[in-house]
């Protein structure tokens, strides 16, 4: 298994983010919102992260949240379908609530909307 998080697993360009948002396939929970595309034409998933200054004013807090999400993706990317994902942090989380954020991310990425894992937006 490859646990690296190389450049090919990231959404880097504005067009990549825009194409994911254009699909309007979003699910959200308390802390996170995940948008996904129907497919990216590649053999692996890619992820983009959005953490605004409105969510957390300090850069170190925003970086911590992105680090937690990247690490979760790095460990679980082999189980994900080859789609593009954009994860937006809706509410600030820290070390005390990072476990909840990881659980929400797993529900949003793997959960089935029919079972109520994450509400369709």
From Swiss-Prot:
Keywords noted in UniProt: Endonuclease, Hydrolase, Nuclease, RNA-binding, tRNA processing
EC number: 3.1.26.5
Top-level EC class as recorded in UniProt: hydrolase
Disulfide pairings: none
Reaction catalyzed: Endonucleolytic cleavage of RNA, removing 5'-extranucleotides from tRNA precursor
UniProt keyword annotation of RNA-binding present: yes
Pfam families with a match to the protein in the record: Ribonuclease_P (PF00825)
Cellular-component GO terms for this entry: ribonuclease P complex
Record-linked InterPro entries: Ribosomal_Su5_D2-typ_SF, Ribsml_uS5_D2-typ_fold_subgr, RNase_P, RNase_P_CS
Keyword Protease assigned: no
A single MF term (Gene Ontology): ribonuclease P activity
HAMAP family: RNase_P
Cited function: RNaseP catalyzes the removal of the 5'-leader sequence from pre-tRNA to produce the mature 5'-terminus. It can also cleave other RNA substrates such as 4.5S RNA. The protein component plays an auxiliary but essential role in vivo by binding to the 5'-leader sequence and broadening the substrate specificity of the ribozyme.
Family to which this protein belongs: Belongs to the RnpA family.
Subunit architecture: Consists of a catalytic RNA component (M1 or rnpB) and a protein subunit.
Protein name (record): Ribonuclease P protein component
Protein encoded by which gene: rnpA
